[in-house]
Amino acid sequence: MNPTVRHPTGPRFPIAVPWHTPYYWTLVITFVRVQRMGRRSTHTPDQLRELILDAAQAIIVANGLAGLSAREIARRIGYSPGTIYNMFENLDDVVLHVEARVLDALDQRIEEAMRVDATEDKVVALAESYLAFTSERPKLWNLLFEHYMPSGADTPPWYQQKLEMLMSRVETAMAPLFAPEDHVALQRSARVLWAGVHGITSLATANKLASVTTDASAILVRDLIRNYLAGLAANSESTQRKVG
């Protein structure tokens, strides 16, 4: 190889530099750094955060949580891994923000589904929207339950608020069945019912029980909700008769 010709895989410089000399590789390193600096200047911090989250979400959808790494995110967005840690505390922080996106999307789907009047129809619509969401985005939904914070690390308050918002949707749908002063009973019943819906959803998504398939899960959820709400109504009537 002619020593004055650039390295076959290296960048082209305006002057002839022997590729096997230290000076050539100094130029290469400088060239790469300048290129990266140029890319960085095109993105604001907010845009860069979104790029990181977009890449992380795409990796999780393709390969699950196990396939996520700072190096892979960096490769996809064209920045160094260190850039990720300038934007987020650590990889767990990145995952939490991806989870927040999932929770926001789920909350929007549920809110749209609840635009019906009858209490039972509202709860059924809420549960069916949950089922549909998990069926459409299984790896993102599984992320909510696969990811654990490191030992000693607390889940941030903003994340807890998003979880509580979802549960408040269930409470809002069931509220007409309870007297205003029965808030504790409403909370308990909402959690009991939603635990049942989540159990059916988990079995359907795992696809390990022949009797709980994705198709059958919608019927099972409707039966669960109608029977549970009927039981609440019967208990309420019984209580009223005793009081009377």
Sequence positions of predicted segments:
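Short secondary-structure transition hinges
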Residues: A132, E136-T172, E181, S211-D215
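Append "Primarily bacterial transcriptional regulators
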Residues: L68-R75, I84
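Alpha-helical DNA-contacting segments of helix-turn-helix folds
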Residues: I60, V94-V102, L144, G152-T155, ...
